[in-house]
Amino acid sequence: MNDEKDLRVRTKMFARRIIRLYCALPKNDAAAQVLGKQALRAGTSVGANYREAHRARSRAEFISKIGDCLKEADETLYWLELLLEENFLPAQKLEPLMKENDELIAVLTTISKRAKANA
């Protein structure tokens, strides 16, 4: 599988894990639901923006969309950290997602740097 397709699959799997995490949050806790919806929105946007990047009409648009991916991934990490720190879910559920998020940020950062260097 090529790297582009692999990252498409990886970001989609990440989004699916975020969806399952949201579904596991307590339904009767308003704070958990607010934080969860924010994580859901940001976490599912990473893959959507990555797909948009590969439909970009220019190198500048590609770089911009990869930047959007990075922003959403960083925001996702923020919401996951709050969910962990407020004990809405156990660390063993959140830490693997946070690790995957960190890895996605690293890959996307590399893509962004290479694209800018080749611009």
What are these language model-derived features?
Residues 1-119:
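Amphipathic alpha-helical assembly/interaction segments
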